[in-house]
């Protein structure tokens, strides 16, 4: 009976944990961000959720151009670049995302960002 309880606990924990780590989606910009950047970021998130990574990337790049000091914009760019197999470019934006994260746990705790940029480099 004890073993059965342990097995059930492990199964329940596993199923509840998987959604939290399965997919890392694009992030909203922080409150108070540039209005144009927010608009482009929302368009990017919409396209990203649809699987239109090239279109999403265009919007995330525009959001970054509007305000390059927002870590979420760089993170979203990096997600698209990763999905498109452009891992070198993704790594550069993951470093920028970390640099400008302002402590955002969604960025700092991302497995994907830590896989791409595991060691701090100058400027990150």
What is the predicted function of each stretch?
Residues 42, 76, 109-111:
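Canonical tetratricopeptide repeat
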Residues 49-50, 83-84, 116-119:
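Register position in tetratricopeptide repeats
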Residues 61-65, 99:
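Conserved structural position within tetratricopeptide repeats
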């Amino acid at each position: 009976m004890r073993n059965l309880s342990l097995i059930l606990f492990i199964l329940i924990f596993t199923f509840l944990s998987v959604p939290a780590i399965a997919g890392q989606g694009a992030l909203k910009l922080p409150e108070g961000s540039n209005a144009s950047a927010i608009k482009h970021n929302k368009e990017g998130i919409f396209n990203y959720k649809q699987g239109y990574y090239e279109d999403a990337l265009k919007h995330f790049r525009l959001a970054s151009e509007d305000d390059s000091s927002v870590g979420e914009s760089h993170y979203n760019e990096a997600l698209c670049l990763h999905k498109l197999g452009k891992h070198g470019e993704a790594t550069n934006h993951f470093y920028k995302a970390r640099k400008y994260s302002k402590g955002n746990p969604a960025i700092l705790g991302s497995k994907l960002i830590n896989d791409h940029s595991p060691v701090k480099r100058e400027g990150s």
